[in-house]
Amino acid sequence: MTDHAAAITALRAQLSALDRTRPVGGRPPVATGVPAIDGALPAGGLVCGGIHEVLPGRHCGAGHGFVAALLGRLPESDGRILWCRAPGPANAALYAPGIAGFGLLPGRLLQVYPRSDEDALWVMEEALRCRRLAAAVGDGLLPTPTQCRRLQLAAEAGDTLGLMLLPPTARPPPSVAMTRWRVAAAPDDPASDGLGRPRWTVNLLRCRGGGAGNWDLEWDDEALRLDLAGPVAHRPVAAAE
């Protein structure tokens, strides 16, 4: 057996060992903790058993921070989190202190580095079906609408939160995910001394059964939560597709 095949077999065995049935009733949505945002989502948060896409700005740092902040809200009792990074020299190991700064304990992460996009999508599908994982993150992957539908079905089967951190691109494919967000870094608070809190401009571009909106957020690194950073432009639009 080749090293590659052995790695795939080992991962399958690890996911199988984790897989146990959760209590009947499913998991509640994952609230962002920001009432203005959660009020714009039909379920009051990100629905588990579904795919949610995050489209970063020119650089992925803001997207990574936003995703880590969301994952940090998952109870530890929900299980571990698989983080699958797309092949490529830029996708090195996640910076543990940076992740911990957003309330996500590095020890909860199972980091996977497939050799091809095909393998990465397979990993995501298997992980989303594993009912003992709290969430699965596809970092740098750009699935086609058909591939995204497969991931959605896998997430529904596992009742698992699926987050796709798309690569920076001017023309992402049409979304079939439950939500699609655009996250970009925002300027620091001019009143802050030195290095201010992380700030992001977050746009909800698509929400199945809901609307859209724009928010300026900042990360409170003492309370470990997201807060509104200033005046909010939140304009509901027609019901989403």
Language model segments and positions:
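Detector for small/aliphatic-rich hydrophobic stretches
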Residues: 1-83, 92, 98-106, 206-210, ...
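Solvent-exposed alpha-helices and their adjacent loops that cap or buttress functional pockets
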Residues: 46-47, 128-130, 156, 194-196
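Conserved beta-strand scaffold positions in the cores of enzyme catalytic domains, especially
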Residues: 51-53, 111, 180
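Generic beta-sheet signal
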Residues: 52, 84, 133-138, 162-167
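Conserved nucleotide-cofactor-binding alpha/beta core module
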Residues: 78-134, 141, 145-149, 154-158
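A polyampholytic, Gly/Pro-enriched intrinsically disordered region
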Residues: 128-137, 184-190
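Phosphate-binding/switch region of NTP-binding enzymes
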Residues: 167-223, 227-231, 238
